[in-house]
Amino acid sequence: MPLSYQHFRKLLLLDEEAGPLEEELPRLADEGLNRRVAEDLNLGNLNVSIPWTHKVGNFTGLYSSTVPCFNPKWQTPSFPDIHLQEDIVDRCKQFVGPLTVNENRRLKLIMPARFYPNVTKYLPLDKGIKPYYPEYVVNHYFQTRHYLHTLWKAGILYKRESTRSASFCGSPYSWEQDLQHGRLVFQTSKRHGDKSFCPQSSGILPRSSVGPCIQSQLRKSRLGPQPEQGQLAGRQQGGSGSIRARVHPSPWGTVGVEPSGSGPTHNCASSSSSCLHQSAVRKAAYSLIPTSKGHSSSGHAVELHHFPPNSSRSRSQGPVLSCWWLQFRNSEPCSEYCLCHIVNLIEDWGPCTEHGEHRIRTPRTPARVTGGVFLVDKNPHNTTESRLVVDFSQFSRGNTRVSWPKFAVPNLQSLTNLLSSNLSWLSLDVSAAFYHLPLHPAAMPHLLVGSSGLSRYVARLSSNSRIINNQHRTMQNLHNSCSRNLYVSLMLLYKTYGWKLHLYSHPIILGFRKIPMGVGLSPFLLAQFTSAICSVVRRAFPHCLAFSYMDDMVLGAKSVQHLESLYAAVTNFLLSLGIHLNPHKTKRWGYSLNFMGYVIGSWGTLPQEHIVQKIKMWFRKLPVNRPIDWKVCQRIVGLLGFAAPFTQCGYPALMPLYACIQAKQAFTFSPTYKAFLTKQYLNLYPVARQRPGLCQVFADATPTGWGLAIGHQRMRGTFVSPLPIHTAELLAACFARSRSGAKLIGTDNSVVLSRKYTSFPWLLGCAANWILRGTSFVYVPSALNPADDPSRGRLGLYRPLLRLLYRPTTGRTSLYADSPSVPSHLPDRVHFASPLHVAWRPP
């Protein structure tokens, strides 16, 4: 007969009317009983022939590919002008006096952050934007490009200009040296065989023209021929007559990439161009355009009249080095959905490429990417804005993976000890926290994102495309890209992006200037940064509490008025460091702080309400007597494990689930086990703050007996049969708690001290978790343990009770370091003649 829930409760000693603990509890350690109960509850039957269930409620397997939902109306979030002050250490010193060793070390880690992977794998540009949304290929392409452009404009990305240089927007740091102190000079690198052309200064162009062709069109490097540079590109000009092109003069040399793959070297003079690209190099290269007057890079429109057409090459002949987008302007429409209808909508499509305000030298950067990007909803509650997901998982895989630095995170008890108080709370939101921390330019070649341009992207994804290879594109296959879908998508996108459609249709390669989210180093750096800042704030305001976990920062003060003045002071300090806060997301919590998924008050800690509701909903949908895929069980354990410390039996209750996941077998919930778990999670108990105190109760055990010292009283008992020593010590601790009611017990066993009961026999672990809930343990060496003699059957000998003080720990977290005392910026001692003097001690 299967075990009923009531019998099971009684067995676990969860009911009040259980028998004497000294008899009942050792029985739960019996292997035979544990095995019989597991069979009755159908917990041990891992091999099942019925098909597995792969979905329970919203839970599917951890690694199942749930397709994210695309929103054509996503808005790209705006990024403030984030610039963390370079002299952050000096500013902190002005604020709080000398910094501690820990604070100094952490702040130096991120000024600038460095990233040196063992091996970097370079991927073709086609893999730059992941085809996550096959239904919305073009829309996703442009939204992602717009997002990347926004990040570049906000100074978060570098743009690769050539193999050895990059440009960026925003304020430069001292380690980002402009080329030749502001003179933008292309270095000739003999080692890699780069032939380069040098404009003389940042705003003024050279007067002499360079000749009919620029050799740097084909940069030969170790990677073989680099992709074509886009600046000399032109579109075929049929008839003569005046053309109007908006020329954007610029000091830049060769740009990142044009559609990759390069054919033979093209003679620039022989391919005529009316798509006059906006580059000073191009202007210098074409002797047809007068260059006697230098132009600043402000982008004035220039009228160019009577540009002679070159009739030496017919429209369909040979490769044309050109801008794919503007080539459509002069071509005949191939259908009503031809892209030339869109290209002819406006006269001025703006520049083919934009350049940043500053230019720096970088290590050699190939025209490739190292990770793909795609867009998703910003978060489950905000589906109107998009978030960029960057996949740099190559650094976490394989034999060459980077082992990321570990950092301590407070566990639940440490967090409760620290934050469970009668303070009034407020939480701050750091906007785009990761993008505050600057990366050294040497890391740029390892963290590249980008795209191969619209033509390649569409060609690669359209199955019927005949563009086999970009380097052999001719005017006939220019129209291979034209399709109804592309036309409709571009028409709709034209309303949103206007002339930027042209800019975004070009290839681009971008490297990270601030730390990206997709690299394992970033959470570590962010945790170090915010913990150092909080440490400084705590020392500046010793009567308050500041604490952070990643980008979540909380402030606590005794009263609401006090908290408001603290908020004003801390906000001003953070803004002076260049940290951007989101004032709309500042939340005032009163006396119950919501933090890291918990509600923390003076009474202790509980899970937040939305998690409790999620658990209840999941139990309603949980099927019984049906094998559930172990990957779904991983999700279940993730949810239940978060709330386990608040239940009677804690983690040990979930051990059967852990076992099935380890065995990679399906798990079947019996009605009794489901009822047991449901009841466990319906009544949650807060985890209380541990209090300091003097230990008066001690427990000890041998495999055959146990002994207690409760004040001056000594007790002992024996086990029916010898038990493993850890099990015996756990039983002794349980007896000490039930006999004395003390919340502080001294023991010499490290396993009991750890309060992890998952390695004990299942039934004993569940029962012990409930008996010892809220108990704190103090380590006492065996030689000094007053319960040592009683456990060995010697009651006559009295060892004196130790004065064992217990201090609750806030954990070894890098996020909360009790700062060693340092001289503050105010004098420590008050002069003895002062009216404030209480008791003067000689210096």
UniProtKB/Swiss-Prot annotation:
The record marks 63 as: Priming of reverse-transcription by covalently linking the first nucleotide of the (-)DNA. GO terms for molecular function: DNA binding; DNA-directed DNA polymerase activity; metal ion binding; RNA-directed DNA polymerase activity; RNA-DNA hybrid ribonuclease activity. Its EC number is 2.7.7.7, 2.7.7.49, 3.1.26.4. GO terms for biological process: DNA replication; symbiont-mediated suppression of host innate immune response. Residues 220-269, 291-316 are annotated as: Disordered. Signal peptide: none annotated. Pfam families: DNA_pol_viral_C, DNA_pol_viral_N, RVT_1. Mg(2+) binds at residues 429, 551-552. Residues 357-600 form the Reverse transcriptase domain. Residues 347-690 are annotated as: Polymerase/reverse transcriptase domain (RT). Residues 1-177 are annotated as: Terminal protein domain (TP). It catalyses: DNA(n) + a 2'-deoxyribonucleoside 5'-triphosphate = DNA(n+1) + diphosphate; Endonucleolytic cleavage to 5'-phosphomonoester. Gene3D superfamilies: 3.30.70.270. Residues 178-346 are annotated as: Spacer. Activated by host HSP70 and HSP40 in vitro to be able to bind the epsilon loop of the pgRNA. Because deletion of the RNase H region renders the protein partly chaperone-independent, the chaperones may be needed indirectly to relieve occlusion of the RNA-binding site by this domain. Inhibited by several reverse-transcriptase inhibitors: Lamivudine, Adefovir and Entecavir. Keywords: DNA replication, DNA-binding, DNA-directed DNA polymerase, Endonuclease, Host-virus interaction, Hydrolase, Inhibition of host innate immune response by virus, Inhibition of host RLR pathway by virus, Magnesium, Metal-binding, Multifunctional enzyme, Nuclease, Nucleotidyltransferase, RNA-directed DNA polymerase, Transferase, Viral immunoevasion. Multifunctional enzyme that converts the viral RNA genome into dsDNA in viral cytoplasmic capsids. This enzyme displays a DNA polymerase activity that can copy either DNA or RNA templates, and a ribonuclease H (RNase H) activity that cleaves the RNA strand of RNA-DNA heteroduplexes in a partially processive 3'- to 5'-endonucleasic mode. Neo-synthesized pregenomic RNA (pgRNA) are encapsidated together with the P protein, and reverse-transcribed inside the nucleocapsid. Terminal protein domain (TP) is hepadnavirus-specific. Spacer domain is highly variable and separates the TP and RT domains. Polymerase/reverse-transcriptase domain (RT) and ribonuclease H domain (RH) are similar to retrovirus reverse transcriptase/RNase H. Belongs to the hepadnaviridae P protein family. Hepadnaviral virions contain probably just one P protein molecule per particle. This is Protein P. It comes from Hepatitis B virus genotype B/C subtype adw (isolate Okinawa/pODW282/1998) (HBV-B).
